[in-house]
Swiss-Prot record:
The gene is acpP. Pathway: Lipid metabolism; fatty acid biosynthesis. Belongs to the acyl carrier protein (ACP) family. PROSITE patterns: CARRIER. This is Acyl carrier protein. Coiled coil: none annotated.
């Protein structure tokens, strides 16, 4: 498991109080993990802080799954 994926999973588990078994790359924040729109905003802010990156609003709208977040962050980090 990549470092980015592990760090994203940790943030999601902590912020959503999610079952670690359900936090997979294909898991939708809203449909699978019970997030609402405010949770999504808080997750994006947590990702920005954890990885020291900026996620523009238009990009944040497309981050719907754990995998989407990992892919975006890896691209930003050049990983």
């Amino acid at each position: 498991m990549s470092d980015v994926l592990e760090r994203v999973r940790k943030i999601v588990i902590e912020h959503l109080d999610a079952d670690p078994e359900k936090v997979t790359e294909k898991a939708s924040f809203i449909d699978d993990l019970g997030a609402d729109s405010l949770d999504n905003v808080e997750l994006v802010m947590a990702f920005e802080e954890e990885f020291d990156i900026e996620i523009p609003d238009d990009a944040a709208e497309h981050i719907q799954t754990v995998g989407d977040a990992v892919k975006f962050i890896q691209e930003r980090l050049g990983a």
